[in-house]
């Protein structure tokens, strides 16, 4: 029988990344740039979300060779993505020794009914959420870390803002509820009532919630921290920009010093062009990655 990590241990590992930036990388060179810029972790994958979106087809777990190349290049934690519901991909990454697994809507879902039972794994998982119902379901499945889904690969922050605001508004609502209201809310959200009771008791999510999906500039990162994010994932925004090294350093600094507007102004000067981006409103429903998962 596989060994499993306790919630306390796995959540504690995720807490260690709080306040930091996690960057998508596709090779050792990019991983070294991310580490030098101050990233707290990297996400190893074959293609950044913008390229996955452009290529179409079926997006799967990265070749283990790519993941190992990144793991061997840096000393910071390494994450990797698996398809929603694909627990064998997750077992493969666990066997490789990755530090975290992202059950990600960026990849093509493998199961349209079940997410992975993350409690059966030693390695901690991160999952996306758009609202408190999704957040609570992922926590009940054993997620140790959450992130907004946003709309990956667009360079457009609007959906990440929407998701962060919604989750936090729903938390405030739950905290003020009586027990009978809480039970009714759990039914409405499709969320386990035990998770909502824990949220009410502690006044927040029991796991960290990072911003992800559309962060492209230092100001974007600072905005998400202002809205209550515990940290920031940057997917396509860095290595699709004109100057990845500068963007990486600037986004890390802006995330740390998100209330220092003079510094953010300084960091934003002379960066070169940000990734071109996509207006989310122009995407057809079937092209919205955030709709994946349930």
Swiss-Prot record:
InterPro entries: Aldolase_TIM, PdxS/SNZ, PdxS/SNZ_N, RibuloseP-bd_barrel. Signal peptide: none annotated. Pathway: Cofactor biosynthesis; pyridoxal 5'-phosphate biosynthesis. GO terms for biological process: amino acid metabolic process; pyridoxal phosphate biosynthetic process; pyridoxine biosynthetic process. D-glyceraldehyde 3-phosphate binds at residue 165. Catalyzes the formation of pyridoxal 5'-phosphate from ribose 5-phosphate (RBP), glyceraldehyde 3-phosphate (G3P) and ammonia. The ammonia is provided by the PdxT subunit. Can also use ribulose 5-phosphate and dihydroxyacetone phosphate as substrates, resulting from enzyme-catalyzed isomerization of RBP and G3P, respectively. This is Pyridoxal 5'-phosphate synthase subunit PdxS. It comes from Geobacillus thermodenitrificans (strain NG80-2). The lineage of its organism: Bacteria, Bacillati, Bacillota, Bacilli, Bacillales.
